[in-house]
Amino acid sequence: MGQSTHQPDRQESQSRVPELDFYGRLGMATLLLEQSPYHKQWPLYDAELELVPPLHLNQCKFYFDQQQNPVAFVTWSSITEATKDKLVNQGGQMQWDDWNSGDLLLFNDFVAPFGHTPEIVKDLRNSDWPCDIAFSLRRAEDGSVKKVNYWWHKKDYKQNDLAQRRQGLKISV
């Protein structure tokens, strides 16, 4: 499986990032999770449902510093409206079959323990996604959903454009 990578410094060549197999990517993700105050509370067994599917399906992107050290990663899924409703209203985790089940883009995990958030958000907004709007869930420590965040594609969208696009969406919470 290929590895999706990004380098904050565009002058660095992506070919310098070593190709990693599934276990190498799992190790990088685990290292970053352990550095994140929010994510390090996860029990290790959550990795089976939260990390293994996106790593196998190549629905993740790693970010590296100039020395090729991993500094962040993002996972996403394409889910159904029913899966979204279940996640928002009941909490819990997706099952394997949920990860590629529909056309709603969910950024499942955004792990950036060393900063780099503005660069990553800019990269995600300028990436080629199959839809204009994605969402992510802000969770409380107990796993319940505190907020549904909506993301719009490309930096030229304005906040009122997003509000107009939302009117046609079913929004829970």
Segments (PLM) and residue ranges:
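Alpha-helical oligomerization segments
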Residues: 153-171
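A short helix-loop-beta-strand connector motif used in the catalytic cores of GNAT acetyltransferases and
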Residues: 50-62, 81
